[in-house]
UniProtKB/Swiss-Prot annotation:
Keywords for this protein: Coiled coil, Endoplasmic reticulum, Membrane, Metal-binding, Transmembrane, Transmembrane helix, Zinc, Zinc-finger
Protein name (Swiss-Prot/TrEMBL): Endoplasmic reticulum junction formation protein lunapark-A
Protein's organism: Takifugu rubripes
Entry's localization field: Endoplasmic reticulum membrane
Zinc finger (C4-type): 277-302
Cytoplasmic side of membrane: 1-43, 89-348
Lumenal domain ranges by topology: 65-67
Family, as annotated: Belongs to the lunapark family.
Amino acid sequence: MSVFCLQAKPTTVEILEGIDKDIQILEDYSVKYQRQMKAVVGRLLLYSILLYLMAGVVVYSWYLPEQLMGRLVLGLPFLLFPLLVWILRKVLILFFARRTEKNNFKLEDLKAQKRKILEDVMETETYKNAKLILERFDPESKKKTDFDSTPVGPQMTPKPGQELRHRNVVPQTPPASVNSASGAAARPPLASGPAYPGRSSHSAPGGPPERNLLAIAAQQSLMRKFVTPGTPIPGVGLHPPGPPLARPVLPRERGVLDRLIEYLVGDGPQNRLALVCQQCLSHNGMALKEEFEYVAFRCAYCYFLNPARKTRPQAPRLPETAGEPKLPCDLNSSSCAAEEDKQSDSGD
């Protein structure tokens, strides 16, 4: 009979449930202690101020003695009363702080005990039971393990300023060329080659490569059709082949130190002007206000040469002084002979 009277050993779930209840109770006690401390200290200060003012008014109105010594003796409690209130406030704060500290110690012990039980569960229980227990009593670690086990694919993040440089250039071509581009898109193996036999797909160094852009656009449209969403497409959003930007594009997100340096030096986006191509209206960087009128650049997207708005003025040539050494000249030259004649005439 004694064997049947023995209580059954509590399971892991029951132990964890009891620990969770105790943790919740202790957390509620911590919040309760904080509220009680604020309420008690606030009431103490409020009642003390009201009592101090009422006592001062009553004593000043009816019980104020005429002698100086009596006034000093009567004013002594008014000087000691604020000190007494301050000491009482400190005692109350210390009392509630000790209770909160003991409560926190118990709370930390229960959390450590729960953590140890969960570690034992992962080692002793089966996968199914351990998963259910973790989902119920430790959802944060479960989410963390699921996040770590989930493979994260590479993401293509644009560099600072790259979103300003990415423009879609659509050249204006007749309908026949559009049809040929669509036909080239229908035949993927021929899209990378030249569009017409006997002609090169590269144009002159100064002109825009229309056929090359058409082939790239057709290839990108074909890749968008057969690629699933979320898969990075190579070559999309990158800088096109060609000359670099005339001036760099300043990033939007700048720190406090960068803004301070820009303010001291006089640099920054507010002190620069954008270099916009006259043909395709693409952004080619930002130049300083002093050099904006004199910058000539080739567009990095359509390769159009944008001339400078003004010609930089050149300083006048300095006049030659008498003390400068003269270059040696040939005696047989006519110029040297003329100079010698002038010198002889002046000597006469």
